[in-house]
Amino acid sequence: MSTIIYPSPIFGPVRSRRLGISLGINLMPDDGKVCTFDCIYCECGFNADRRPHHPRPTREMVRTALEERLRQMKNEGQMPDVLTFAGNGEPTAHPDFAGIIDDTIALRDALCPAAKVSVLSNATLAHRPEVREALLRVDNNILKLDTVDADYIQRVNAPTGKYDVNEVIKTLQSYDGHLIIQTLFMKGTSRGRSVDNTGEEYVGPWLKALESIAPSQVMIYTIDRETPDHDLCKATPEELDRIAERVQRLGFPVSVSY
């Protein structure tokens, strides 16, 4: 099973394709994955294969570990560009997510004021008031929308609970532009069916959704590491560039990771 489980609560720093030198904050257990999606491309593997036995780190554990690591990096003269909530699952699912965001912003302001605070989220819980208020306080509120096709979402993102893409789009609209939309494009098959979302059938409706959401930026990327479903393929640079050009024509800044 060639997938990645990250240390918790702090890992890195790592060089992010999209964010620069990133110090990771993992709010999930250090021995498994807890996520509201079960994506067939997730670098952490399938949920059922990565059931954790350890608890999530507490708010105090996160604050203490982050402060220690930032002080160490400061002493070494190597400060991060960004503090990134990511890791083994959905960060907003942590019961103390909002408080942890408060602590992180305070530590950032005190120890590395030039760094940004980023959250990588699948947006399944972005409608919750306490999650929304916390996400509005971070610099980079990066929310996933791989497609607006309900069947594709069920097959590829595999939500573990109720997921209505139209309701999610309404939630994304409610952020009034304080969000970055992140979308993964890929090719290949899963269980004998195509998962290619680079064609007009998927890209056209997705672009219409972007127009209604009006994000501050769009990040498009493709798979970069081994995936639990082994029949997936990268989208080509040419395909990603063509999609990016269409995003730019809508007036949104776009970054592409190949």
Q: Model-derived features: where do they sit?
A:
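Auxiliary Fe-S-binding modules of radical SAM enzymes
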Residues: 1-18, 71, 187-258
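Short hydrophobic-acidic sequence motifs that mark active-site Asp/Glu residues
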Residues: 22-24, 82, 142, 180
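Short strand->helix junction
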Residues: 32, 90-91
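Conserved alpha-helical substructure of the radical SAM core
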Residues: 46-82, 96-99
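Residues at or immediately flanking beta-strands
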Residues: 79-82, 116, 217, 253
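Short glycine-rich or small-residue beta-strand-to-loop segments that form or flank ligand, phosphate
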Residues: 83-88
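Conserved AdoMet/S-adenosylmethionine-binding subsite of the radical SAM
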Residues: 93-221, 226-233
